[in-house]
Amino acid sequence: MIEIILNGERKTIDPQASVTAVLAANGYDCGRVAVAINSTFVARADYDRQKFVVGDRVDVVAPMAGG
């Protein structure tokens, strides 16, 4: 297991977990969020291939509607 920081919270994940798997495990809809790892945008097409390393800082951003 490895530790990452997901939106400011420490999370322990499988070292082989993809972005898709981590998002799903934490209640995010992969089709409705943007992801950056260590301030670098991850293309949605890469979610299944992108892996994490110890200490990665992961930011998940969802669009908000407002008026």
Please report, for each region that a protein language model flagged, where it lies by residue.
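Ubiquitin-like/PB1-type beta-grasp interaction modules and other compact soluble beta-rich domains
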Residues: 1-66
